[in-house]
Amino acid sequence: MKISQLVRMFILAAPLSGAAAAADDSAAALNLVFPAFKPEVYERVEIAVSGMPAAANPFDPEVVALDAEVAAPSGKVVRVPGFFERQFSRKLEGGREVLEGGAEGWRIRWLPVEPGRHTLSVRATLAGKIAARGEAVIEAVPGKRHGLARVDLMGMRWFRLDDGTPLFLDGLCMCWHGRRGTYDYDDWLESSQKAGINYIRLWMWHQAFGIEWDRGDKLKYRMDNAWRLDRVLAEAERRGVLVMLCLDYHGIFEIKPDYWGGNNFWPHHPYNAANGGSCQLQNEFFTNAEARKLYEKRLRYIVARWSAFPNLLAWEFFNEIDNEYACLKHADVVAWHRDLGRFLRGIDPCRHLISSSFTGGSERPDLYALPEMDFSQYHSYNEPHPAEMMAAKTERFFEEYRKPFLVSEYGTDWRGWKPATDPHFRALHQALWSGAFTGAAGTAMSWWWENIHSANLYPHWSALAAFLEGTGIGRADLRPARFDTVEGGVKPFGISSRTEALVWLLDRAVDWPDGATNAVPPSLTGAKVVLTGVDDGAWSVQWWNTAEGKRVTDAQAVASDGRLRLEPPAFQADIAARLSKK
């Protein structure tokens, strides 16, 4: 449905919606306008609020704030902060997105997570004192939505949705847009949906969705970028795509231009004392009380505006924070993540997952050990044999932290898109497919999204999505498989339970960078592997072409003494199998 249609529906529904009188004589009345239809559980509700008291700065909750207490039928009460916004419209002029500002106002976004009648008690405060009140009753009805992403507490290795549906992430980074702005995401997300991609990563930074970046931004958030993020999150939701939202990145601490000739934003940062902030040095971002207070206010705004999106997978505090450890202290960074993680968890009514990330090839154990960090991440660049990397890192990180693990950035070279080193995209293919066969919570997240789109490399994702459809991937009983016999020049990877397994065999001759320039690798025959730890008896085996995402042949096998012998048909580069106990 188009945004304009949604807006019309909202306006037309307003006369049928509820508006509350003041709760007492000393407070004015807030007018709450919301759609007339009953929302489904996990369907975002937008409430326009008028009657707010005038204030000098609508972004400072110490000056003026809007909050709702929502009492659910179960008796659970959550607090949902409201936010000030400005509407925009967009158009393309000369290949560049141009925004035109529109109406301003206050809004509450709320996500019902159970059916039944919910009572919303809304209040506006001015300098900490109640200035206006309103109440509303909204009934949520059962629907088909699966809920929010959580850690599967049964096995701790995977994600799941609230209704228990297993969640394996098949995606890539799409961190910012180009000159076409949100129009880029219209194209990228359409292609993602067609390819079965269910997960992307966005950054809030100066080039795209950042709201507090420059000298004049302190507590004066950028409404144009906020509107862009609204639109992209809504489009991703419509396309069935989850989003990990990265709130900051290492460039805010850089002073000198980096390898790419930029990313040195500390001289412009609003928390920098040179710009009227409270931080003389970059590390004071993590230790200064005023800086923390400002960041908590920004987090409140972020939660108010975007936590109600059910496709928000996680908040990621920082991208590659240790890129700037020359001017930062790791202990202070960890303490900040602990404290702000607790703060964020406490104000987020949906309790989305939380994480953070380090530079390529780096790991800092004490941060991921924090209970405030729900999953661990690794960025892989310039590493040979991506499937082995994925298997080794997944096993090590899981053994260390007992949390889901993601390779959330991947590339054959951190310096840029280098197709000459991977002309047939085997590294990309192997990084993607290996994620599904090593116990990782998702595929490796390729970094070079614009190049991937222009080269139409989405079939690598769609083939994997087709293979995984209908499997049990993400179930708590599926764990990295073990093989005790390997013959015929293959590397085996897999996940298995006693009665189900997914197996992927990689020809060693094209294990990137080996054989990278070989356009047509020879057909591999005579491979044999033995999968262990399975129930005895008859098994069905489906062999799949991984380039096309299609079944090529079915076979039968018999397990004895917990061992299942697999003999694939002839294949080129790699082949996958779906196995199930009869």
Region locations from a protein language model:
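Bacterial N-terminal signal peptides
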Residues: 8-18
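Boundary at the C-terminal end of the N-terminal hydrophobic targeting segment
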Residues: 19-23
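Non-catalytic, glycine-rich low-complexity segments
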Residues: 24-74, 80-82, 86, 137-141, ...
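Aromatic- and carboxylate-lined catalytic core of secreted/periplasmic carbohydrate-active enzymes
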Residues: 32-33, 37, 54-56, 413-416, ...
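Short, hydrophobic beta-strand segments
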Residues: 49-51, 106-113, 568-570
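Active-site mouth of glycoside hydrolases
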Residues: 63-65, 125-127, 143-387
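Extended acidic/polar, glycine-enriched regions
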Residues: 76-78, 83-154
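Extracellular glycoside hydrolase catalytic/binding regions
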Residues: 297, 304, 321-468, 522-524
